[in-house]
Amino acid sequence: MMMRDGNISGPKKKKFTTKCRPFSFYKNRHIIMLINDESVYLYNLTLKPPSYYISSIVGQFYKQDNSTKNAQQLVLVSSTTLQLFEINEEAGKLELQSSQNLLGIINSIEKICLSEVDGVVITSDSGNLSILQYDNKTKKFISKIQEPMTKNGWGRNYVGENLAIDPENRCILVAAMEKNKLFYKIESNSSGSKELSSPLEAHSKQVLCLKIVALNTDHNNPLFGALELTPEKKCIINYYELDQGLNHVVKKKPNSSNSDPLPNDVNYLIPLPGHIGGMVVCGTNWCFYDKLDGPRIYLPLPRRNGQTQDSIIVNHVTHVLKKKKFFILLQNALGDLFKLTVDYDFDKEIIKNISITYFDTIPPALSLNIFKNGFLFANVLNNDKLLYQFEKLGDDLTEGELVINSSDYESLNSVRESVTSFKLKGLDNLALIDVLETLSPITDSKIIDSKLVTLSSHSYVKSITHGVPTTTLVESPLPITPTDIFTTKLSLESANDEYLVISSSLSSKTLVLSIGEVVEDVEDSEFVLDQPTIAVQQVGIASVVQIYSNGIKHVRTVNGNKKTTDWFPPAGITITHATTNNQQVLIALSNLSVVYFEIDATDDQLIEYQDRLEIATTITAMAIQENISEKSPFAIIGCSDETIQVVSLQEHNCLEIKSLQALSANSSSLKMLKSSGKETHVHIGMENGVYARIKIDTINGNLSNSRVKYIGSKPVSLSVIKFSNEIEGILAISSAPWISYLYRDSFKITPLLEIDITNGSSFISEDIGGEGIVGIKDNNLIIFSVGKEDSVFDPSQDLTIATTKLRYTPRKMITNGNRLFISESEYNVQGPFKCNINGDVKENVDEDYYEAFGYEWKQNSWASCIQVVDSKSNQVIQSLQLDGNESIVSMSAVSFNKTSTPSVPASHLVVGVCTNQTILPNSYDKSYLYTFKIGKKHLQLVHKTELDHIPQVLENFQDKLLVASGNHIRLYDIGQKQLLKKSTTIIDFSTNINKIIPQTNRIIICDSHKSSIVFAKFDESQNQFVPFADDVMKRQITSIMNLDIDTLIGGDKFGNIFVTRIDEDISKQADDDWTILKTQDGILNSCPYKLQNLIEFHIGDIITSFNLGCLNLAGTESVIYTGLQGTIGLLIPLVSKSEVELLFNLQLYMQQSQNNLVGKDHLKLRSYYNPIKNVIDGDLLERFLEFDISLKIEISRKLNKSVNDIEKKLIDLRNRSAF
């Protein structure tokens, strides 16, 4: 794949294309496919699913094995993904149990009781009402019920907009925003499983349904409360009752005593538990309790002391205690939590009082969930999700704290006139214990040194790196230069490693250290210390063997005394390699012989097998299965002829070669490991830096199903490490250390970050809290653990996120050498910082306070700044706060009278701002261009230029500043006091230019309304841009990038990705025969020539950025895209015809075989707005890896391929550019 940057011109234009023969037909089992050599074929993969979770629910979705407690789990659902988490109470962490791409767009989700466990009810764009249940065997949700409700897609009459389930699981209500409401009764069939009856309709004409909640009726008919809007724009409350006896729906209105008109600022409904019933209706600074046959009870909502912000409830969670007691936590839009309690008279069945108190302040959330074991999960809006633990319930109020009682208020007017305020405080009742890192929303991204740097999560720069963090525990120098390191325990029953053995082949020495509270020399080890050690192993019950160059030292502990036995090779022969486990020892001699020993279980004696194996070539590595209770049936021997041999160690054919496997290079290290009690794999480190994994049949020793990964330029060294009691893996060290392990039937290989070692070994000690790794680098000993400090290793996470806090919502990021220039603007916010663009200003701002409680809200106000971040240290090195009520709308780095290249960064930074800007309706007072000089350390203001238009787009074009606004494009050059206008162009058929890509002598214009994409060339004779080609399809572009000088990839606001290209002949004519081309007349108020559409694909998220690059070592350059909801995806170019044909046909069979959990047709999903074209959906194809073996074989036979061939192709595709 060859690509050229749009800023580079030349005589030859290379295309972003696949190398296929022209117009070939391929026929396989009645499947015909057309491939064109001018087409682009891409393979889509989702690397990180959306992390904007629209809802979260807590329930008992599966029962834990051997657990008497009814543990609860957490379900998080984004627009396309369903994830299940479990709380590890000992570590206080959320652990991911399952993550599924539903291949549909989720609208809402609720919990439903399915006999012994809970399930989830989902409404989606498929038009089905879906009920899913978690299968603990497959660790996935499976479909139980698919009930068609309406047609596919969205609309005002889509009944899945609102979802409510009766608390006693008797019926489900789904309601459209307009008119339609459907009631499904939940019934049990003869087998005891749940099923849905035919729906009962309850249509409400001429009203809009804003919100519906299910009410508790204490075994009476199911009842639902609805907030609706009349044609007169008045809010009303209606009740809908399902009469189970007559099997129809009755619409009821509040009784006459509750018929007071509702204020139009009503926004939220909260149902109360069963013995009380009814609901709390909330509005701006007020709420009241309403019940169908009871009086209303009014209360004001607390407001922050000394601030003018209103208190608007946006979220709540109800928690029921023992003896029918309960409390409700209300959260307003600022994040303040209020505790609502009800004083209920059970004898008279009336409410005596409702009280509200201030509880705590946490970030504003979309949903809150309380676990029975005392945890609170906050599904935070546009930021990391937070897990809290209850320290107390807020009952011990001190004197002076706010308590609001309903008995003090009689009417809604008295409540609305009342102002009750409280004083903010730090967390008192809650304690933060875990953070679930998310990326939503992503507004921009760049690839820097194989890291994806994003502007995300409200106000952060987040650098995403493929790798697992490490924590260094001990680092100390050694008296020798080590070349190898080993750890061992002294007895079989010992849980901890007790000896640390360091070997040096350079100085022919061995150092034995004891492991405990301190690391010190061992004087009585009985080891040979004047020769380098090859292996150390605890064998039998209480023995240790040391294998060194000239023999084997066997140290036995008998009645507390150490006894030694020596074994020596023949004279002049040395030991070159060794591999051991608790019962077996295998060594290789310099005369190419292999000697095998076993341990006598009765007295720990070392018994030599009488025969020896003679190898024809030099042995480079060897391995037997480690850390097992039984004997290893085979040994693996690597030879210098680039092969590995499988040698039997079984009694009937001991030391017999069973099979052989050719490699791409000599093996430098070998390990054999049984993965999670299932398959056994041979792990191979090669001298060319390739790490391979091959499955071995433990019955006959056959090798199959190989997987390879390039991990560095140096020979690969392997060692077995233990991450936890359940997970063992491999430490692979080349140019950098990597770890590989099997987790939930998925094999992961991930680099270790922030550590540099040349050799390592597993290390278990209570003094470091469990499992760790001890390594060597130069003359230093390093002990470290895998995972972040004070946290356990999470095998489900192979991405590390480094964060840098910003002030406001980041909008755009520009790279300049090692610095990032970031523009930030936030609406309806009053910033506490003073303007300092003309120089430093002394100020004392408590940033911790604003981090906890947020900035003060102010209507139609803006807070904006520019921050400079060092991309290496992730530190903010300069902050420039803008003056007054200014908002940043655009920013660009410009080289005035100087060519900008990657080695010569731009000289100036230009920022476009508006004053007093408002949104809906859109307006502004004045607009300016700030010009800053980019210095070696800081930005320095040069001058300020006033404009008569909003600077919507700024770009660098031919050493001038290009400014686009509306349908005008202007060029500016730098002056002494302001920027000087040099050119003006009006694009008649454009309306609102929002993106421009500059090239050498032409630009690519994007319009968010009418003309979509336009190619224009700068005509020096006319001193303006002349458009000559545009897109045939009108799109609302959100992001765009050059693939080559003629090819573009873009995304629109509806979640579609497309690739378009200008015809090669037209592009050449624009360069060579411009005089003729520019005189061509346009067609129907557009350009004379049209672009070719090459790719169409629906992602389901609004694309905010594209980057060319890769996220792994020596990977293929691909397109990496980010979505607003936190999606990170990859588009890999497919480079051969056979590959395209295989994947295309596999996709067809997968579409036929795949059972979608929400009932969405895959072709309709990926063709939401335009038919899918030339993109293979890797998210669908990777489900092949999860199929049972019978279905895999059925599909593979249709494709004339083996199952292993298909699996290997899918894994190799992912490894090309990602992980």
Curated annotation (Swiss-Prot):
A GO MF annotation of the entry reads: U2 snRNA binding
Q: Where in the cell is it found?
A: Nucleus
Task: Note the SS bond partners.
Answer: none
Q: Name one GO biological process term.
A: mRNA splicing, via spliceosome
Q: What InterPro entries does this protein's entry cite?
A: Beta-prop_RSE1/DDB1/CPSF1_1st, Cleavage/polyA-sp_fac_asu_C, RSE1/DDB1/CFT1/CPSF1, WD40/YVTN_repeat-like_dom_sf
Q: Name one GO cellular component term.
A: nucleus
Major localization listed first in the record, in broad terms: nucleus
Keyword Nucleus listed? The answer is: yes
**Keywords for this entry?**
mRNA processing, mRNA splicing, Nucleus, Spliceosome
Kindly name one Pfam family recorded for this protein.
CPSF_A
Transmembrane regions listed in the UniProt entry: none
The UniProt record lists the keyword GTP-binding: no
Protein origin, superkingdom: Eukaryota
Function statement:
Involved in pre-mRNA splicing and cell cycle control.
Instruction: Name the family the entry cites.
Output: Belongs to the RSE1 family.
User: How is the subunit organization of this protein annotated in UniProt?
Assistant: Associated with the spliceosome.
Name-wise, this protein is Pre-mRNA-splicing factor RSE1
| Species name | Candida albicans (strain SC5314 / ATCC MYA-2876)
Gene from which this protein is expressed: RSE1
